């Protein structure tokens, strides 16, 4: 391995941010080791590793939004427009040696790759100022991709970005469901493949008929599309996503905090199969 930085022994009273390399290369795996001495001459050593993300100059993907006409959001349960399914199919001629996906959206999204979730995070990309900062997430997809057809799926709901209770109009930008993603694949033969959000992205309304970060979600199981995020699915009635030139890559920043995950699932206390007349439920 090439040593990119060696501080040598630094005599200082500081115990954090002592020194470091001026610039690290993007999309690069690094190992580090540090040895610390105390005032008695005793020392201890620790080693670990990290990987740098995509830099702002390396974004080649297009912002792609739903073709649906803009709908003004209103407060209240069930008043929001449906969530949007974004589907991007692509074909690989070889199994990847390394694959990283960088993704974000305007809204909140749930990612699937060939029908499987790469991790269990929820509410990505979470709440930021949007105008000045929008976080993107990094996923290791190496084990989820295969030779032949592959499918990236993103289901996007309103989240904080479109919520009338948390986000006033942002400089006149309409809060359409919009995605941005870039998949960087290193092939076994040393070649490189890039898959981006572009005109190849297809869209469809989700079975989630309305979603609000405070008021909850309205789901119609009759409208579910089994297999929509898997190879072999026929997307004949899907509409192509529309390129959104209003968005800027300059606000993108790698996520800097831990993801939101589910730590406990509460079982349902009441299940209704059929109600023949109007009924009031007190839960």
Regions found by a protein language model. Give the residues of each.
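Short, surface-exposed loop motifs enriched in S/T, G, D/E and P with embedded aromatic residues
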Residues: 265-272
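Recognizes extended acidic, P/S/T-rich segments that occur
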Residues: 1-29, 39-42, 63
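An aromatic-rich alpha-helical recognition segment common to small helix-rich domains
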Residues: 19, 33-34, 275
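Single conserved hydrophobic/aromatic residue that forms the stacking wall/gate
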Residues: 273-283
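Extracellular and select intracellular beta-sandwich modules with Ser/Thr-enriched
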Residues: 43-47
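Accessory beta-strand-rich segments of carbohydrate-active enzymes
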Residues: 29-33, 38, 51-56, 76, ...
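Short, solvent-exposed loop/edge segments of extracellular or virion-exposed proteins
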Residues: 63-74
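Catalytic cores of secreted or luminal carbohydrate-active enzymes
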Residues: 226-261
């Amino acid at each position: 391995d090439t040593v990119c930085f060696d501080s040598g022994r630094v005599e200082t009273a500081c115990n954090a941010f002592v020194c470091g390399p001026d610039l690290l290369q993007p999309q690069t795996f690094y190992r580090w080791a540090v040895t610390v001495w105390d005032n008695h001459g005793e020392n201890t050593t620790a080693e670990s590793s990290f990987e740098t993300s995509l830099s702002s100059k390396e974004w080649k993907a297009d912002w792609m939004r739903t073709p649906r006409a803009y709908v003004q959001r209103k407060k209240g349960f069930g008043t929001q427009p449906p969530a949007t399914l974004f589907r991007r199919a692509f074909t690989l001629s070889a199994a990847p040696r390394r694959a990283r996906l960088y993704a974000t959206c305007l809204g909140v999204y749930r990612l699937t790759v060939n029908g499987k979730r790469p991790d269990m995070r929820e509410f990505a990309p979470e709440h930021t100022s949007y105008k000045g900062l929008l976080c993107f997430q990094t996923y290791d997809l190496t084990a989820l991709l295969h030779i032949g057809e592959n499918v990236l799926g993103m289901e996007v709901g309103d989240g904080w970005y479109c919520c009338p209770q948390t986000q006033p109009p942002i400089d006149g930008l309409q809060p359409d469901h919009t995605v941005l993603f870039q998949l960087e694949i290193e092939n076994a033969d040393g070649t490189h493949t890039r898959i981006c959000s572009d005109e190849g992205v297809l869209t469809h309304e989700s079975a989630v008929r309305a979603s609000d970060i405070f008021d909850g979600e309205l789901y119609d199981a009759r409208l579910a599309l089994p297999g929509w995020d898997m190879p072999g699915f026929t997307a004949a009635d899907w509409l192509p996503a529309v390129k959104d030139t209003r968005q800027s890559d300059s606000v993108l920043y790698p996520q800097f905090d831990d993801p939101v995950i589910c730590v406990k699932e509460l079982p349902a206390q009441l299940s209704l199969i059929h109600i023949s007349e109007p009924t009031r439920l007190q839960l």
